[in-house]
Amino acid sequence: MFNAEWLEMLRRAAIVLICACPSAAVISVSLAYIKSIGAAAKLGIFVKGEDCIESMAMAETMVFDKTGTITEGRYVITYVFPVNMTERELLTTAASAEVFSRHPIAYALREAVGIRSAKDMKVTQVEEIPGRGVSAIVGDELVYVGNTALLEEHGISCELPSRSGAAIHVAVDGKYCGHILVADRIRSGAFDALESLRVQGIKKMVLLTGDVLSVARPLASKLNFDMLRAELKPEDKLSALAYLMSNKGSKSSVAFVGDGYNDRALMERVDVGIAMGALGSEAAFMSADVLVMDRDIRKLPKAIGISKLAS
């Protein structure tokens, strides 16, 4: 034994140790994971277990939902184009139909006209159509607020915006009433965070969004995403994830980053789901494997780095 090279000596010593003290070896591995989970928690990143640490360490594909993850999720109204009504009337109609919605665009509409609650508002039969918008009875009028697909499904033609931006179209009792353009800002630190993730071993960055291609493409290009899927309905996002999962390597994993609320089904379809801004969100705690308490996207590469140290 003493004539062997030192690496071979070390290997033989490890074999003897594991055979003699298997429990100690198991404990040391578990302690490494526990230490990593503790280190992440100090940064406001909560990991549900050892398997989640391992899945993060193996991640080579990371999929991002756009709104509230890559962007701030705080929309501002940039342009109002009314048809046969005033700008104020168009905004009020849209905000009223969206009075119960938790979508960031709905918040922007309500803020624009000063709606704070649904109290004393005559809004009934509200239906949120995933990937489309909402329909509601406002007063005694049927209102649709959403994208072109929603209105066209009900035989209503939309006027295409002459300016850039995400368009919210409005129709009342089957008649087109105009559109509202909104914009969101890229989250601070997003570019640096994505570049750091590449250094940590993420080989493919994917952006999924319901936004039209003309809005999503400049953002994806600016942040150097490898793959963009735009104008997606919720079921389209599931299909995109299924494709990525079926084409991953045998020793790699797919991670999805979202808010854990609007994308709960997506979190459950990947190897590791990461929820941003999870503080106070019961849905995020239920669906995600990793919870980033705030929305600091710069913590993602830190989480990946910590997971690799444990594996």
PLM ranges: what are they?
Residues 1-64, 220-221, 226-230, 298-300, ...:
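Hydrophobic alpha-helical transmembrane segments
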Residues 27-38, 76-79, 108-112, 287:
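Re-entrant/interfacial helical elements at transmembrane boundaries that shape
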